Amino acid sequence: MLDKDKAEKALDLAMSQIEKQFGKGAIMRLGNEEALPDIASIPTGSLSLDIALGVGGVPRGRVIEIFGPESSGKTTLALHVISEAQKLGGIAAFVDAEHALDIGYARKLGVKTDDLLVSQPDTGEQALEIAETLVRSGAIDVLVVDSVAALVPKAEIEGDMGDSHMGLQARLMSQALRKLTGIISKSNCCVIFINQIRMKIGVMFGNPETTTGGNALKFYASVRMDIRKIAALKQGNDMIGSRTRVKVVKNKVAPPFKEVEFDILYGEGISKEGDILDLAVERNVVEKSGAWFSYGKERIGQGRENSRLFLKEHPEITAEIREKLVNPQQDAATPGAA
């Protein structure tokens, strides 16, 4: 066994060889908080998720997969990314293979629907050809494909009900991703695939869940996010939204396996104020004493919901707290000082 110094030098040499051969980020220490330098990103609409992703959002020039059960918030999260990209002056496209895009809901999430490019393709091949053409143009900042499960191969659509088409969709995805990854990287476009969950038959041990479309997307995706609804949010007897957990199950641009929770409110999307409040309490930027929440010398509310509404009504205080969370070195400044 090598002594510690020699082992460290040998390890550094091995890591540099791996990075030289396979690119920066092929290997990293899990405890290392530093993400890869110079990675441009698009915010997700949730500050806690941006921090968990390690680069301030979803990375540009990469393939992203968002998967989860039905009604877990997959499309909501993707629409928030589109909204944030548009705020930065970017152009977004939505390949609606499910033919289920709700324009009114997208507008409520802040998407400029007049500027959004939408395609509703007839076949999986058509959807992926359109995606390739848009990405190759170099003008698109974010492209969402909703969803992989709805990318039905032409042969299956033209065939009869009951015909067997084993592995057709997996082959289609594999071929498309082989073509797409290079141009996605060169164009600096963020391509988000939304995916559904299926159950493997006959799995006795381990997780029986799997995603549709074969294994290609699992390999080609730089970031994979597992999104789940964990609780219903109620106001009296009315359901107003859901508590959502996102786990970053794969991340090639920063350490993976981070988990975050936030609220998705019906008709509003991700509750940004609630997300900032939870994160601020966790990082001691906002103090919680009993049911009261205080920021500096000011009490902002009794109970989480009242405090969230206070932040919604006072965007300048929300922006100040957000700045302290994004740049922790400013915590030394007096909290609440305007």
From Swiss-Prot:
Subcellular location: Cytoplasm
Annotated GO CC locations: cytosol
Sequence intervals crossing the membrane: none
Protein's UniProt keywords contain Lipid metabolism: no
Alphabetical list of SUPFAM superfamilies matching this protein: P-loop containing nucleoside triphosphate hydrolases, RecA protein, C-terminal domain
Database matches in Gene3D superfamilies: P-loop containing nucleotide triphosphate hydrolases
Residues annotated for ATP binding in this entry: G68, P69, E70, S71, S72, G73, K74, T75
CDD domains on file: RecA
GO terms for biological process, alphabetical: DNA recombination; DNA repair; SOS response
Record keywords: ATP-binding, Cytoplasm, DNA damage, DNA recombination, DNA repair, DNA-binding, Nucleotide-binding, SOS response
GO molecular function list: ATP binding; ATP hydrolysis activity; ATP-dependent DNA damage sensor activity; damaged DNA binding; single-stranded DNA binding
HAMAP family xrefs: RecA
Record-stated family: Belongs to the RecA family.
Name of the featured protein: Protein RecA
Species for this entry: Citrifermentans bemidjiense (strain ATCC BAA-1014 / DSM 16622 / JCM 12645 / Bem)
